[in-house]
Structure formats: structure tokens, C-alpha cells
Amino acid sequence: MRRKNSDLKDSTTASHAAAWRQQLHSRLKEGVLIALGALCLYLWMALLTYDSADPSWSHSSQVDQVQNAAGRLGAVSADILFMTLGYFAYLFPLLLGIKTWQVFRRRNLPWEWNTWLFSWRLVGLIFLILAGSALAYIHFHASGHMPASASAGGAIGQSLGRVAVDALNVQGSTLVFFALFLFGLTVFADLSWFKVMDVTGKITLDFFELIQNAFNRWMGARAERKQLVAQLREVDERVAEVVAPSVPDRREQSKAKERLLEREEALAKHMSEREKRPPPKIDPPPSPKAPEPSKRVLKEKQAPLFVDTAVEGTLPPLSLLDPAEVKQKSYSPESLEAMSRLLEIKLKEFGVEVSVDSVHPGPVITRFEIQPAAGVKVSRISNLAKDLARSLAVISVRVVEVIPGKTTVGIEIPNEDRQMVRFSEVLSSPEYDEHKSTVPLALGHDIGGRPIITDLAKMPHLLVAGTTGSGKSVGVNAMLLSILFKSTPSEARLIMIDPKMLELSIYEGIPHLLCPVVTDMKEAANALRWSVAEMERRYRLMAAMGVRNLAGFNRKVKDAEEAGTPLTDPLFRRESPDDEPPQLSTLPTIVVVVDEFADMMMIVGKKVEELIARIAQKARAAGIHLILATQRPSVDVITGLIKANIPTRIAFQVSSKIDSRTILDQGGAEQLLGHGDMLYLPPGTGLPIRVHGAFVSDDEVHRVVEAWKLRGAPDYIEDILAGVDEGGGGGGSFDGGDGSGEGSEDDPLYDEAVRFVTESRRASISAVQRKLKIGYNRAARMIEAMEMAGVVTPMNTNGSREVIAPAPVRD
């Protein structure tokens, strides 16, 4: 028991001793820091009050009274620092004080001696002293406040500066010593320049915010003063009414009555004008009921129920899409009128006199059309967009400066409860059903809830841009499904280029594809070259037929088939008198979709820009259209050449006005709400239309793709991805020939090529080229020799051949 008590007593004594030592160590540390701080102040005082007449280290003096505030020791210390460091002597106490303050801030942390860290701090201090003194010697001259024999950099700076200037000149020496100075400051003071920039930026922003808040408070106080003055005047008038009868002076009493009558007349006039002023015209809010279905929807509802297989050549039903949700009741006319009055009040607080003329509520935003007072510039209202958003407590406010056919200015304010626009709503509308184009694009609803259906053939190309998460990919899916619900593979074909390998790969296997979804950027360039070659081939074909566009060509072919006299290919080259030209068939519209052409331009280079520009310039009449999408709307991606040839653009939400101007040549996209909210710039106009994009889920896309796969397999043209000469035809002359003069029936590989073609039933030049590992020109001559020998048929209008000869019998 005694042993336990003694052990407990010893442990208690040890703990008390440890605590006492820790407390003593903390107090000693504080004392040392106080002493160092006092030393810094003492040196600073000695330097500031230095007098060259005082006795010092560099010279003697007979003066009895020392002028230096730090005394004789201070005069000697200042003289030594000036003679050694020059002007840098002023910074030496400051650096010592900074390090003292840094240690003082960590006084409560456990202190451990670190030789490595102390050595680096000492190296940093040495670099600071050497570089600072040298810079002072190079760029400054000694003043009368310093010793007569001292230079601006002291003895250290003078020695280093002379050597450095002789070797590196003034500019080079400055660069080297400045870098050493910054390095020394970083190591000695543990300073991060990135943190310095962050702190500086934050201080600057806080300063400007402080000024802005002070200005807003001043404006608010000014408005309150004006309101208070008006109230005081009204009180004075009321008091005058009561006091006036008791005034003995008849003359003053009559003047008071006259002033009162004038005020009453002015008040009555103002009230009558306010009552006569009509309330703002409020459009009826979008009906919560479902819109009237189109004829196609009604027809699909009456379709037979026991049809298990999809019929080839038919369109998938719209029932594959998710049904539209029931709309909730939106704002009442009273709330919209109150909102319009609030908007007038807020603008008046900012010094802009307006009146709300009409209100147009929509599913996502509400547009207030305001009539500015005489002399009010629209730019003043546009500059108040962010202030209005703050004062109205909304995400963003977009100002429409010009409304065609009206003198009003539009202010678009987001609704509190945003309604989702389902894709089935847009496709079920009569506008989509009655659209005659084979490549319609269902974008969504406008601000009033009406469906927006555009024609890609009239655009004829489209540029889509927006930041990540703005709804760009969903918008591209909606455009593709618009085409798939309207056109069969004989009417529209697709070439999809997907550098990200995620967005468009879901469409792999649908019969509309001319080639597999392209994910290799080299093959993407080949696909664009094939498109250029197909464009040239179609132009030659239409020129020979005497038509001006693809619609005229297809109409002429159909009329000839109905008349029983089908047309033949005018570009067919007869190899023998027995050869018959193939019959012409209608040509489909080709849509080239590039999901992220910024990545394609980065990998392939400027050649892609030239191919895109060439297609955009000439491919409209040939029925080839581009849809280019990117999430990086910068000038090196959306170049002037591309913008000049693609006037139709869609901008989703972007991060800055610069990006909006890059896409639309005007601002506005930075004020969108995201999630499919877009600005659509139609061809031939400079005024964008705000559209709320329709939402398409991944499940809906999968259902539509599976429905098309049941209706047929894709008929790929393999030559598309092999590389085609732009001057060739649709089956084109591809690059990569080996220059061999062989290729006829005398070619040693001809028999092997025939065996491969007849066994695989693929009469493709690129397939022979890959199988035999030969150049394109040699493989092309082999295929031509097979055509002359009757092994394969001549080239069809779509660039493919059929194998006639049977496969050889193997032993």
C-alpha cells in the first residue's frame, strides 16, 4: 500500500515538474521574442536618426553630444550596417521583425530544433542580403544621409554589383539578383507567391465590393431623404390646413388657401392619370392541360395491338418516349401584375423610369415588355441586369434590347417553379407532324410554351456550343431523335463522329448509319473527305440531270419511275458494248454529326477546318448537312472561317460574355439558366430566339435505337473510313497507293484477291487493300479487272458493288 502511494506521489511530482518546465519554456520563448522585437525597433530607430557627424565605426568625431536617438552604440551600429549593406540596411530590421512575428504566431506549438530547416532559413537570409545589396548598388546612388564613403549597396553590394555588371550587363544582373532576392525571401520567410496573389486579389475584390456597397448605401440614403422630404412637405401642408384659419393675417391666409388648392388639383390630376393608365397586358399562362395531339399520335393509338415484329420501312411509334407530365398551375394574373409593379419600382430605384406594357408568362421564364420613358437609353437597362437579379432575388435576368416590330424592351425573369419540357410534348405537336422536311430538328419550347421545329435543310448547317452541364449533349440527342422519328434510312443517312466515345456510341447499329460511329480521329478526317467527295459526285450527277438541288433530283427520279421510264446513271463509264448503266434511285440526305470537334481539330489539325469549310460552303444543294457541337467555345475552335460558313448557331449556357460573343457575335448566353436553356440564332437574322430545350433521357434513346435495330441492319459503306481523294467519286480514289504498276490479271496477287472477294462476298477496294497489304491504286486496278472479267458488278449509285461469281471450290 505504501509502495502504491509512493509511486502515485512520484508520478504526480513528475507531471507537475513537466508542466512547470513547459510553462517556463513558454515564458522564456515569449521573453526572447520580446527582446528580438525590441532589437528590431532599436536598429530601425538607429538607422532613421543616423547623423554622419556622430562618432562611428568608419570615422571618429570630437562631438560630445551624439545626435542619434539610439545613442553612441546606435550610431556605431547604423554606421556598420550602412557601410556593409547600403540602403538594404533599412530592410534588415524589417526582415528580422517579420521572422520574429512568424515565430511569435507559433509560440503555443511545441518547439523542436531542426538543423536542416534552420540552415535553409539562413541560406535564404544570405541570398536576401547579397541580392538586395547588389540591386541597391546597381540602381541607386548614395545620399547624404549615409556615410560619405558608403555606396548605395554597401561594401557587399559594391563588390557583387561590379563583378555582375562586367559579366552580365545591367539588365542581366538585375534579372539574376531579382530572382535570387525572390528565392531568398521565399525560403527565409516561408512565403508562397501564389498565396500572395490570392490574398491580393481577395483584397482588391473586397475593396471594390466595399466601394460598391458604399455607393448603394449612398443611393439608398439619397432616395430615403427624398422620400422623407416629400413626407415632410405633406405634413407641412396638413399642418397649414389646420393652422391657417387661426392666422390673423388675412393676406397670409389667402396665400395658404391658394397653395392648398394648387396642391389638391395636382394630386387629383395625378390620381386621375394613374386610374386612366391601363394595366399591363397579361397573356394567359400556359395551360396545365395536355396540348392537342397530332394526327400521327391519334393514328398510332388506333394501330393493331397484336403486331409483334416491326415492319421494315416504317417509323417507330412516339409511345417509345416518356409521356409529358401534367403541368402545375402557374402564376395568376394578379401575381403577374404585382410582379410588373415591383419591376417598375426596382428600376425606378436605380434611376430608370419605365412602365410595363405587357407580360408573357412561360414554362421556365416570364418576359416583361417595358416601355422606357423618353430619353432613357436601352444600354442603361442592360447594364442593370445583375443588379435587377440581386434586387429581385433571382438567378439571372436577361434583357432583350430589341423585340422585332415593337418599341418595348424585354426583361426575362426565371419562374420560381420551373417546368420540365418533355421531348414527347414537342414531337406530339401538330407542328412536328406537319413538317415536310426529312431532317427536322425539334429543339423545345419558346418562352410562351410553343414548340420550336426547325429545318436542317434550310439552315443548312448548325453550330452548337455550351459549357459542361448546360444540356448540350441532351440537345444533340433530341436533334438526332427528331430525324429518326421522321425519316427512314432511304430518306436520311447519318455519319456520327464521337471523339469522347460515350455520347453517340449508343446509336451504333441503327440502319441510318453510313459507317460505324467514328471514334478514331484519323478515320474522322477520312469521313469528312468522303463527304466532300460524295458532294462533288452529287454535283456532277445533278449537273448531268439538269437539276439544281437534291429535292429536284429526287423529284425527277420519282416522276420517271412513276411514268415507267426509269432514269439511268449518266456518269456510268462503259467498259464494253454489253455493259448497261445502272438505274438511278433517290439519294438520301446525309447528316454529319460531330459531338466534339474541338478535340478533332486538336488531333487532326487545320485540315479539318478546311474540310468543314468546304462542306459548309457547297454541300447545301447536295443534301449534306453538318451539326458541329463543342463544349469549348473559344476562337481557336470556333474560327472565323467556320463562323462565316455556318450562320445558324445554338448557344447553351456559357461562363462569360466573351464565350457568348464567340458563338453568337453578341452577349446573352451567359445569362441563361442551364439545363437545356438555349439561344437559337436562325439563318438570315441577328436576333436570337430563347428556347427551352426538350429533355431526352438515356432510356428513351435506348428504346428508339432498339426499335430501329428491329427494322433493319445498317448498310455500311466501308470506303468511308479508308481515306478518299476529294476529287474522286463517291467510292473515291483514296490516298496511300504504293505506286506499283501491276494490278491487272497478270498481277501475282490477282487470283488471291479474286478468291478473297468471292469468299467474303465483299467487293471493296479497302478490304482487298487490307487483306493483301497492298496500296490502294493496286487494289483498285484489281477490282476494275474483276469488273471487266465479270466477277463483280459495276459501281452502284451509292458506291458499292455486288459479287457475281461464285466462290471457288476448295479441294
From Swiss-Prot:
Residues 449-661 form the FtsK domain. GO terms for biological process: cell division; cellular response to antibiotic; chromosome segregation. Consists of an N-terminal domain, which is sufficient for the localization to the septal ring and is required for cell division, followed by a linker domain, and a C-terminal domain, which forms the translocation motor involved in chromosome segregation. The C-terminal domain can be further subdivided into alpha, beta and gamma subdomains. The alpha and beta subdomains multimerise to produce a hexameric ring, contain the nucleotide binding motif and form the DNA pump. Keywords: ATP-binding, Cell cycle, Cell division, Cell inner membrane, Cell membrane, Chromosome partition, DNA-binding, Membrane, Nucleotide-binding, Transmembrane, Transmembrane helix. It comes from Pseudomonas aeruginosa (strain ATCC 15692 / DSM 22644 / CIP 104116 / JCM 14847 / LMG 12228 / 1C / PRS 101 / PAO1). This is DNA translocase FtsK. Its main location: membrane. Gene3D superfamilies: 3.30.980.40, P-loop containing nucleotide triphosphate hydrolases, Winged helix-like DNA-binding domain superfamily/Winged helix DNA-binding domain. It is a multi-pass membrane protein. Residues 281-291 have a biased composition (Pro residues). InterPro entries: FtsK/SpoIIIE/SftA, FtsK_4TM, FtsK_alpha, FtsK_dom, Ftsk_gamma, P-loop_NTPase, WH-like_DNA-bd_sf, WH_DNA-bd_sf. Residues 269-280 have a biased composition (Basic and acidic residues). The lineage of its organism: Bacteria, Pseudomonadati, Pseudomonadota, Gammaproteobacteria, Pseudomonadales. One of its GO terms (cellular component) is plasma membrane. ATP binds at G469, S470, G471, K472, S473, V474, H675, G693, A694. The gene is ftsK. Residues 269-296, 728-748 are annotated as: Disordered. Coiled coil: none annotated. Residues 728-742 have a biased composition (Gly residues). Residues 195-811 are cytoplasmic. Pfam families: FtsK_4TM (PF13491), FtsK_alpha (PF17854), FtsK_gamma (PF09397), FtsK_SpoIIIE (PF01580). Homohexamer. Forms a ring that surrounds DNA. The keyword NAD does not apply. The chain crosses the membrane at residues 31-53, 73-95, 116-138, 148-165, 172-194.
